[in-house]
Amino acid sequence: MSFSDSGSSSYGGEYKNFRQITRERLLCEMLRPERNGSSKLTWKVLVMDKFTVKIMSSACKMSEITQEGISLVEVITKHRQPMTAMEVIYFIQPTEENVTAFLSDMTGKSPLYKKAFVFFSSPVSRSLVNLIKKDMRAMKRIGGLKEMNLEYISMDIQGFVTNNENALEELFCDDENHQRADACLNVVAKRIATVLASLKEYPFVRYRGAKALDATTMTTYRELIPTKLAASVWNCLARYKQTIEDFPQTETCELLILDRSIDQIAPLIHEWTYDAMCHDLLNMEGNKYTHEVPSKTGDKPEKKEVLLDEEDSIWVELRDAHIADASERLHEKMTNFVSKNKAAQLKHSSKDFGDLSSKDLQKMVHALPQYSEQIDKLSLHVEIARTINRTIMEQGLRDLGQLEQDLVFGDAGRKDVIKFLSTNHIISHESKLRLIMIVAAIYPKKFEGEKGRKMMELAKLSGDDVVAVNNMRLLGPVHTECKKSTTGSFPLKFDVLKTKRAARRDRVGETQTWQLSRFYPIVEELVEKLSKGHLPKQDYPCMNEPKPTFYSGSLSPSASPVLPHSRRTPTWARRHLSDDGYFSDSVLGRASSGFKRKGQRIFVFIVGGATRSELRVCHKLTEKLDREVILGSSSFLDPLTFLTKMKQLNEEEEISLDDIVI
């Protein structure tokens, strides 16, 4: 019985992106059978737990799993029929419950399977190893045991989550003994470490440090969240250096650990890119979108679920584009398609693109069966763009978006918000709450006491809404003197780290082709500074500080001058149209074409939830810096989810540094 890891390093040879490596490890390292020179495929059963099912489904298609010899996929907690003539692969978390269930499967008078190959998603404790070794009946039927060290869900070609959906509540809510928060951080750290293990990366671990850590300062648990998480990740990596074969012994990349307090505005502001607006304005479940399609029998429209992911080339091309740009490109695709296909011209007749309905597009499918897949995809995105643009008009989001961005960049203030709330009656209640929370985060002193209460009354906020606004202070690094206030109630105050009213400054050298595209998340600035070695050490300490030559010598791509460019970068240039009206140089095509990058990877992890805008800038900076920037988080947040979570937070008591054990 051996616990080992194999797998090619992420450096050397053909470049493979984060998601490709994840997929190949699951398919080739775990599922692919050893045929021993025989071409005959031996079918096996695959048994997983609820979490590893998510891991597998996020990276691999069912058809890919079947091609590797898996005939049946089962869940370990459910009752299963015996398959005594078949071998089984277990991909499970190393928990006592899972190990007990696995041993039960393989023992007794009638074991469920002929032989078991067990792959654990993360390191196994010594006690569980001993539990397995003690069961001699099960040991006879075990063909192999291995730690895969792959316990994360790939959400994007450059994004992953650790599946800690409640991390924001667990880390920022009041919990006097902090046991729940510590347990959450330990799980998150272990899963971050498995990402690095999968890619064979050993990082410089940098984190957002707590402010003013000295004996005279009172601090809160939440200020130490990145510090504690960094320490826990470091401990996991130290173990991997000793136990994983070919794991790097010197630093190969950079990891920046942050929490949600780094940017309170990003989860609230209306983002105007296609991806962000889909997750904000449409009723999506993760990447799943449900829409109605015309019935083939002529009856009522049928509901259809589709995934907006990297298998959809149109989605990959448009996701980071401004909604106006995305709409223009869809118009161009349709125009080009119709101009190249006579049958489509007949069906299109004299109708303008904007007048085409889903039914019209369905008629095209019947007229052009050879293009059915392309038309289905195109009609889907035409419908989505139309729905988004209609919602923008109905809810007055353009005016709201302009005010939000003016607030963020210091071009508007409290009086402008009061005027807007007094005169605008079509924006939704949720949008009003988001606007008020942005004001509270940017202009704390103008939101104290009576002024803040009047603004919330003007917006007609409910009691739960007021709680969400008040709880914004929990996401900021609150600094207080040792002497506590003797007042019974607290005023609504927020920590202020800025002397200017603007929460953002316009980025030098970047022009905005599209309106409402000024906003950018703080992560963009941090990653650029990190790549140049300009992050201030006192604010972002490093567990293993690099030598001065690291940034000047080894990362030449990031040191190259970057020319200013607009939102419509060459990535989205309109060229090389194929005969069917699609762009042949799509992002997906380039991503999978095996191109090489010279720069070392940058990992950014935001505990407490990440946003679509933060994922967008990771796509952008990967091209700009010539380094793969990978965003990780405990979960991805859409605005509505963030509002719900903020209503569930409570103010916590302050603690002394003496109470913190790292």
From Swiss-Prot:
Q: Which domain of life is it from?
A: Eukaryota
Going by the UniProt record, its keywords in alphabetical order are:
Protein transport, Transport
Output the InterPro entries linked to this UniProt entry.
Sec-1-like_dom1, Sec-1-like_dom3a, Sec1-like, Sec1-like_dom2, Sec1-like_sf
- Coiled coil regions, renumbered to chain: none
Q: Name one GO biological process term.
A: vesicle-mediated transport
This chain's function reads: Involved in the vesicle trafficking. Binds syntaxins.
Q: Which family does it belong to?
A: Belongs to the STXBP/unc-18/SEC1 family.
Under what name is this protein listed? Protein transport Sec1b
Q: Which organism is it from?
A: Arabidopsis thaliana (Mouse-ear cress)
Gene symbol here is: SEC1B
